Amino acid sequence: MSRYLVLYRANASVWPVDPKESLAVLEGVFAGGDQLLRTGMATEIGWFTAQEGYAIFQADSKDSVVGMIQPFFPYYSQDVHEIVPWDQAKNAILENARRAAAR
């Protein structure tokens, strides 16, 4: 299984301006986040500001993660990045650099 970093940011243009409607959206967002954590789909969710944050997922594929975060759109835009473990990335990068240097 791979790990994925999701960076999310609120889309202010689609949020309701009525405070009661905005509260309803926030309650739904937090309930969704709680569900992702409770089921283990997300291993960590955090905030940088009140408008943007991150989540860490462990999943079989990027498209699985995209499916899990789709319900938060259009209120939040997300960027999904696969996390390559240090040793795997180091070995791949050095192997390619050594091949290029040997030419």
Tell what function each PLM region has.
Residues S2-R103:
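Conserved, structured core segments of small domains
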